[in-house]
């Protein structure tokens, strides 16, 4: 086996080496020595794990993103030591995996001795003002989440990092390093390629590992996928794909592989926006047609107002304050029957990751508008209450999937500290968020008939969007031309 050094970069807002990071580093240790570099200090338990698992551990100031981490690691190792390795791997925590035997990938690439450096996947050329610099063009390149450099390129590789400047933003990191690394070394005469062959997808997707991760894992031998698949902004995802990539990826990992995907999701939940994860993973279920033998325990308003402990193996029913107006009317109509509540409670057995369930948002458009408005109004109070409970969470502009309608169902195990006092509207927003902090998802449910109606509402909404699309495009061109003329007149 080749002598290989793996420089593994990790970052976690709470200083953790989470479950997915540990799995990756431990698996990579089977194919090389792991140099673990962390942006920011590690928590004591994570530091102890890293020191026991990895060959070297470097904790550095959280500056420069991945560029800063790789640069400090390379410079600390030094050129003389780097030259003792056949290959040096740069990889980071944004990849999850490996799924299957990662050694097979290295064995396959050993069959290409003509390459001087190679990567896992590539990003195809695209126009981008955000990442493309002055020319607004991103070239085709190896994605920086996994790059392998061979020994004959090592001197120039070391010189590259000696000269590398620390980026001040994520955009700078992509623009000045990731999109330029491949071209820089290709211009020096070094040959490169990627392990995963996606040439047939180049005309469809500029970023195949995000657009079709399940395809790459199942059919192209790719041993890794992006964590971001599960929390990318869903509106952005719908601009590129049909919005099903993450759910398909999860189902494949869960049913066809041994990869501990639920451990990854539990690690992501406390640090990523709940709404984005719920949308990408479609945490929305049709009520099972069963007798509904699991009757939830009612927690009345007086009990909720005081706060209470919960039994971990029990399911509880929480009534919510009634809304006013037309929205209140439709919220009341969405209240499940006793049978439907019992059927919904059975969903907890089928979905162990779910800690909170509630009715889907009513189809009346005003309910979504009012929920978004109330979330923006209540968000500062919710953030303050989370801080008081010592539960730092990222709150998105998009409201959490729950609460909706007039009730919530909760799994006792999702609240090991119990429920805090719940009286006001901002209090009840805490329920899905506290479950999220404890590594549990929130999901909505509805009947099959409601789901069929929702599809018709979606069709009507899309038709309306198509109708106004040309108007917005015309407005955009008008504004663009006006700005161009103003710029020209100012010269």
Residue map of PLM features:
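ER/Golgi luminal nucleotide-sugar-dependent glycosyltransferases, focusing on the catalytic module
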Residues: 1-491
